[in-house]
């Protein structure tokens, strides 16, 4: 959907804004979902992180756009099993920072990873663990909207699952 002012007068597009492209990006063979959009002033573009699905499971893919009509796709940047991803809107100590939720032997926790170029990611660090016990977020946690920078630090919202999504 598009609007001149972002408040009213919305026009629904006849086609989805970003469609899977499995011939060029085989990790999208079973579809794409769950985009997180971050405007990055340094790039003067929007960075869209999204979940791409293939036989290997959900992975994290990234695309850049200025107009939401054309996209420069980077393809998969975090291999399966990973999702719930967003980029911070500015570099941290010279590196791009990405919050994501890989499924590891440790569980479904939130991690932060760093990249010099948005292609190559490393310095993976556990950021927030799902709680143990009967809490609403005791089994899995994941990032909700992209982080918001405040005068007191980064505000991060997350969702959680105890045993099942319902």
Model-derived regions: residue spans:
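Active-site/ligand-binding surface loops and adjacent short beta/alpha elements
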Residues: 144-146
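Beta-rich carbohydrate-recognition and catalytic domains
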Residues: 1-30, 39-139, 148-166
């Amino acid at each position: 959907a598009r609007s001149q002012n972002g408040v009213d007068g919305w026009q629904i597009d006849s086609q989805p804004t970003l469609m899977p492209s499995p011939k060029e990006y085989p990790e999208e063979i079973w579809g794409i979902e769950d985009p997180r959009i971050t405007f990055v002033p340094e790039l003067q573009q929007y960075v869209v992180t999204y979940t791409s699905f293939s036989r290997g499971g959900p992975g994290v893919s990234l695309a850049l756009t200025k107009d939401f009509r054309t996209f420069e796709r980077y393809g998969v940047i975090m291999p399966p099993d990973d999702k719930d991803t967003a980029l911070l809107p500015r570099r941290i100590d010279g590196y791009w920072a990405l919050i994501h939720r890989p499924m590891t032997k440790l569980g479904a926790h939130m991690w932060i990873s760093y990249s010099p170029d948005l292609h190559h990611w490393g310095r993976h660090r556990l950021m927030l663990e799902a709680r143990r016990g009967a809490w609403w977020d005791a089994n899995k946690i994941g990032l909700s909207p992209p982080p918001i920078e405040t005068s007191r630090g980064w505000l991060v919202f997350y969702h959680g699952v105890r045993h099942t999504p319902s």
